[in-house]
Amino acid sequence: AQEVQAYAKRPKIHRLNAASTMRDKGAWYKDEWRKKVERIGNLNYPDDARRQRIYGSLRLLVSINRDGSLYEVQVLESSGQAVLDQAAQRIVRLAAPYAPFTGDLADIDRLEIIRTWRFERGDRLSSN
């Protein structure tokens, strides 16, 4: 009986990645989230990367709680440049909190978004 209760109490986690389409559950949320982090990221592009002309890409897992608060941010694949990895994590924290879950995400406790972040020439950040 305790195992059943523990299973029932575990958080409902939904994962979105680059392969998720606009028809997938939470696709609208992922798109709004992407726009926000790109806007914040371009406003807060890392000075060290700009000065030293460091470019690259990394994969990041961002986990968001139902209320929009940040649960976790984790580098899954490093860019090989600590300044970029740290900047991506900082940008996620600066952009928080995010919108609370509504609509098709209302029954989800935590949303995991996995994206590739690109720090590009022209000091531009994009993610997909």
Regions from the PLM with identified roles:
Residues 29, 42-45, 54, 80, ...:
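Amphipathic alpha-helical protein-protein interaction surfaces
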Residues 50-55, 108:
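Short loop/turn motifs at secondary-structure junctions and domain boundaries
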Residues 1-17, 38-41, 65-77, 86-100, ...:
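Conserved "boundary/linchpin" sites in short secondary-structure elements
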Residues 1, 53-59:
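Short, small/polar residue-rich loop motifs at catalytic or cofactor-binding pockets
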Residues 20-31, 79-83:
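Soluble non-cytosolic domains of exported or imported proteins
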Residues 29, 33, 45, 84-88:
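Stable alpha-helical elements in mature extracytoplasmic
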Residues 45-50, 103-104:
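Surface-exposed patches in mature extracellular/periplasmic domains of secreted proteins
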